[in-house]
Amino acid sequence: MRAVLLGAPGSGKGTQGERLSQQYGIPQVSTGDLLRAAVAAGSELGKQAKAAMDAGELVSDQIVIGIIRERLTQPDAAKGYILDGFPRNFTQAQALDEMLATLERPLQAIILLDVNFEVLMRRLTGRRTCQACGAIYNIYFSPPEVDHRCDKCNSDQLVQRSDDNEETISNRLRVYEAQTAPLVDYYEAQGKLYKVDGEDDITKIAKNIGQILETAR
């Protein structure tokens, strides 16, 4: 199975990607993780990516596509893969399709996790992390049993990330929406886009995605 998980920040892409990876025995390919690994390994593409990041620039699509290509030609991706976090826009989608065509391994399904803007805001602004043990909560959906106190270690150091404020998150979501609209149209035209209600519980979402992937095989 060769698939892409699309969704806004807070839509649950990472969680569903992990479940699909385990279920199908195929790698979850996150561009963020790939870039960090390439930089750490000191590969040629990793060096180019590091140079861009050190200069405060975005890593070019050409470099990212090259790193993805290297990853998808590894043995564990022979049966398929789940792309998480890429493509982010129309240009990247076209470049990805062109690269996959050279490998003769086109995408089979693009899963869009559809979540209401207000729900995304609550998911992201409500996140709290225990500084003592790393446990993660959400004050709206999965709060600690006692306000401001960690269930696991009893610490009162539950903090909100500095970039989890409403203004920053709202801007991130607006940018995502603007970039993703043409991407959705692009994959719909190919007949490969499937929308899944990302507000259901995690198990039901996973079941719905699994049914789609079985059909798309």
Swiss-Prot record:
Gene3D superfamilies on file: P-loop containing nucleotide triphosphate hydrolases (3.40.50.300)
List of residues binding ATP: 10-15, 127, 136-137, 200
Keyword Membrane attached: no
One GO biological process term: AMP salvage
Catalytic activity: AMP + ATP = 2 ADP
Residues the entry annotates as binding Zn(2+): 130, 133, 150, 153
Gene Ontology terms: cellular component: cytoplasm
Residue numbers binding AMP: 31, 36, 57-59, 85-88, 92, 161, 172
Keywords: ATP-binding, Cytoplasm, Kinase, Metal-binding, Nucleotide biosynthesis, Nucleotide-binding, Transferase, Zinc
SUPFAM superfamilies xref list: P-loop containing nucleoside triphosphate hydrolases
Region (NMP): 30-59
Disulfide topology: none
GO MF annotation list: adenylate kinase activity; ATP binding; zinc ion binding
Source species, domain of life: Bacteria
Pathway recorded for this protein: Purine metabolism; AMP biosynthesis via salvage pathway; AMP from ADP: step 1/1
Start and end residues of each stretch annotated as LID: 126-164
Location in or out of the cell: Cytoplasm
This enzyme's EC code(s): 2.7.4.3
Subunit and partners: Monomer.
Described function: Catalyzes the reversible transfer of the terminal phosphate group between ATP and AMP. Plays an important role in cellular energy homeostasis and in adenine nucleotide metabolism.
Protein family: Belongs to the adenylate kinase family.
HAMAP family: Adenylate_kinase_Adk (MF_00235)
Notes on the domains: Consists of three domains, a large central CORE domain and two small peripheral domains, NMPbind and LID, which undergo movements during catalysis. The LID domain closes over the site of phosphoryl transfer upon ATP binding. Assembling and dissambling the active center during each catalytic cycle provides an effective means to prevent ATP hydrolysis. Some bacteria have evolved a zinc-coordinating structure that stabilizes the LID domain.
Protein's UniProt name: Adenylate kinase
Organism per entry: Nitrosococcus oceani (strain ATCC 19707 / BCRC 17464 / JCM 30415 / NCIMB 11848 / C-107)
Classification lineage: Bacteria, Pseudomonadati, Pseudomonadota, Gammaproteobacteria, Chromatiales
